[in-house]
Structure formats: structure tokens, C-alpha cells
């Protein structure tokens, strides 16, 4: 063997690094870089007439497109799998922009996906003079439940002094964000009312005011979000993607707050089966993003969460971790919250207090597949795993 080997190139930055190592003339970069990144892009619900045009155009550019057999013979619509380099896609986009059957919109979608796939740094401006810097390293969100019935730590931090002590511990352990929840989202729990939720939150927030920490509030209620944001909160972590309370979005727009949109069919579309788990979640998150932006919330204040543990099977949750990179096509920072969840227990046959290793494995996998923020109970251990994983992923060569 001579040392020849396959090399995995995930983006244009890595492609450029390889060309530099080889000693390629920089003048050749514009011609070589678009050929070095290969991507498969799945288009949803394309008319068969449009699918045939896409296939013909992609083939003529040297790429490939897979369409349904019936697309050649009948009317209707279906999915299309595109296969090609960045060069193929750029040529295809230029052609589709002048084609009928809605293909101009498809061209824009492909263009946006390709932009989103490249790594980037982003600063989200938050209320009260704070900002969230994403892209340099994985951020750690520490979980603080001030509830009697949360699945993992319910009842431990009902007293505000105990809650603040735990928050300070997590800050010392490396948390970048403290996510405070005052109403359990457990399926069998009795949901606290808005007044009770606020009464649990405000004493803790008041005592945390002196801490140099970003505070996220885990709520779907507009009334609670308003009270929290007016008392020092920076982010609203909405488990309902704006569908559980119509009053939440106007508050977010008014306060120009950052929001985490979590996918969740448990309370919203109970029992509705998935046709394609990942594609369906992407579509529903895309709808939520569009709804927020149309209402006046800047798109750069939105973070997405595929909602591990909410209306998915254990296998579905594992698949979401495996295919988390697919969600990068939405162009938003990604948060993952898998810590101590039941799918880990079902996979490993472990009770909730025995799920540390499974939770840490989920953290590492999520980061390797594109997570920007990990929401965890075990901050110190998760911080170490995140730091190690970040260093591996950022290593040159």
C-alpha cells in the first residue's frame, strides 16, 4: 500500500484545506472547490413534469437525479433525489430559474440549502444587552426544573434558594445558558397554570439577576413569556413551535426575543403517523419558522430543536441523532435535548438515574452531526465531552 485512501470532505473549508496541503495553485481554487463537495439533496412533492425537467437538466450537467418510475408516464407529484457536486448544483440552479412548473422556487430552495450547509459563526442579539455567539464551540444549556413532577429532577429545586444554588453550580461547571422550566411537559403530569408557572419562575430569576448568565425560559405560554422577558429572561424555549398558545408569538415580536422552536406532535397532532420522520419534522419546523418571520420576528433570532422524546419512537429518536445533519438545510442553529430521556433507558435497559453514559453518547453524536447547543442535566460531564468533541471536529487535516 502506498498510503492512498478515501478522504471525507464535508464542506468547502475542508476542501480548501486539502488543496492547500497538496500545494495546488490558488488560481485553480475557483474551478476545483465546487467539484470537491458532493451532496445528495432530497426535494419533496415535485410535480412529475417538473421532476422530468430537473432530471434532464441535472444529467446534462454531469450530475444525477432519481425520480419515481410513474413520473415518466403519469400526472401527479413525488420526491426527487439530486446527486451532484457544488458545480453541478450551481449550473442546475441557473437553468431552473428560467423554467416553468414552480421550478424557480425549487432553484431558490436548493440555493438556500447549499448556503446553509457551509459552517458559519453567528451572533444572536438578545434582550437586556446580552448576545449568544454560535459556531465557535458547542454551547451548554443546563436544565433547571422548578417543578414537583419533571421526569428526572422533579421536586428537587422547588425552593428558590435550592434552585439558585443549583444554577450557580451549573454555571461553575461550564453552562452557557440556564434553561428554567416551571411546568412539566411529561405526558402524565398535571400542567401548571400560567399564574403558578410565573410564581415559580420569578423568585428564581430575581435571585439570578446578578449572575452573568443567559437565561432561557421553558414555556409555551405568552403570558409567562412576557413576565419572564420583563424580569430578565433572554430566550424562550417553546416546546410547541408557536402552536400551543397564539399569544406567544406577539410577545416574542414585541420583545424581539430569541426563541427555540421545538418540534412536538404529542400535544399538537397526537396519533398522526409520520410518512418520513426527518422530512416531516423539517417541513413542520420550516412552517413554524415561516410563521414567525411573517409575523415580524427576525429569522436570525430563531433556533430549532427536532424534539427528541416528543412523539417519537425510541428508534425514531436514535434516527434523529444519526441524521441531525439533515436539519442544517433549514439554516438555523440546532439545539438537541436528549439528556436522560426514556429512549436512552429503553435502548440500554436503564432507569432515569443510570443514563449518564447514554446521555453523553448522545451529546457527542449530536455535536458531530451539527448541534450548536446541547441541553443537559449533567453539565460538568457534558462540558468535557463537548470540548473534546469540538476539538476533534475542528482539527485540521
Which residues fall in each region the model found?
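Short, flexible, solvent-exposed loop/turn segments with mixed acidic/basic and small polar residues
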Residues: 25-35, 65-75
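Catalytic domains of carbohydrate-active enzymes, especially glycoside hydrolases
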Residues: 165-181
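Active-site-adjacent loop and "lid" segments of alpha/beta metabolic enzymes
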Residues: 2-13, 45, 49, 53-56, ...
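Short amphipathic alpha-helices in soluble, non-transmembrane regions
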Residues: 58, 91-100
Amino acid at each position: 500500500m502506498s498510503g492512498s485512501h478515501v478522504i471525507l470532505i464535508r464542506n468547502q473549508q475542508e476542501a480548501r484545506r486539502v488543496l492547500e496541503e497538496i500545494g495546488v495553485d490558488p488560481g485553480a481554487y475557483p474551478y476545483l472547490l465546487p467539484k470537491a463537495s458532493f451532496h445528495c439533496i432530497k426535494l419533496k412533492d415535485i410535480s412529475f413534469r417538473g421532476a422530468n425537467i430537473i432530471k434532464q437538466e441535472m444529467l446534462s450537467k454531469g450530475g444525477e437525479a432519481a425520480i419515481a418510475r410513474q413520473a415518466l408516464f403519469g400526472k401527479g407529484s413525488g420526491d426527487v433525489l439530486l446527486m451532484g457536486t457544488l458545480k453541478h448544483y450551481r449550473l442546475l440552479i441557473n437553468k431552473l430559474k428560467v423554467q416553468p412548473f414552480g421550478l424557480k422556487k425549487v432553484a431558490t430552495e436548493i440555493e438556500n440549502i447549499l448556503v446553509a450547509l457551509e459552517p458559519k459563526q453567528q451572533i444572536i442579539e438578545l434582550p437586556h444587552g446580552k448576545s449568544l455567539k454560535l459556531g465557535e464551540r458547542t454551547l451548554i444549556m443546563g436544565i433547571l426544573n422548578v417543578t414537583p413532577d419533571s421526569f428526572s429532577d422533579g421536586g428537587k429545586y422547588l425552593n428558590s434558594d435550592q434552585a439558585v444554588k443549583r444554577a450557580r453550580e451549573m454555571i461553575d461547571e461550564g453552562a452557557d445558558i440556564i434553561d428554567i422550566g416551571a411546568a412539566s411537559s411529561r405526558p402524565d403530569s398535571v400542567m401548571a397554570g400560567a399564574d403558578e408557572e410565573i410564581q415559580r419562575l420569578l423568585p428564581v430569576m430575581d435571585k439570578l439577576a446578578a449572575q452573568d448568565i443567559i437565561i432561557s425560559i421553558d414555556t409555551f405560554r405568552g403570558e409567562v413569556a412576557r413576565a419572564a422577558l420583563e424580569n430578565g429572561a433572554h430566550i424562550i424555549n417553546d416546546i410547541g413551535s408557536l402552536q400551543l398558545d397564539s399569544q406567544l408569538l406577539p410577545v416574542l415580536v414585541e420583545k424581539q426575543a430569541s426563541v427555540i422552536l421545538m418540534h412536538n406532535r404529542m400535544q399538537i397532532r397526537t396519533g398522526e403517523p409520520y410518512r418520513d420522520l426527518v422530512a416531516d419534522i423539517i417541513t413542520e419546523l420550516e412552517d413554524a419558522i415561516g410563521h414567525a418571520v411573517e409575523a415580524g420576528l427576525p429569522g436570525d433570532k430563531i433556533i430549532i430543536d427536532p424534539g427528541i422524546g416528543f412523539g417519537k419512537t425510541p428508534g425514531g429518536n436514535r434516527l434523529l441523532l444519526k441524521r441531525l445533519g439533515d436539519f442544517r438545510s433549514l439554516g438555523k442553529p440546532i439545539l438537541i435535548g436528549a439528556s436522560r430521556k426514556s429512549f436512552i433507558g429503553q435502548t440500554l435497559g436503564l432507569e432515569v438515574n443510570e443514563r449518564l453514559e447514554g446521555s453523553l453518547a448522545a451529546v457527542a453524536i449530536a455535536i458531530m452531526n451539527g448541534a450548536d447547543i446541547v441541553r443537559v442535566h449533567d453539565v460538568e460531564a457534558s462540558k468535557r465531552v463537548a470540548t473534546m468533541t469540538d476539538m476533534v471536529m475542528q482539527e485540521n487535516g
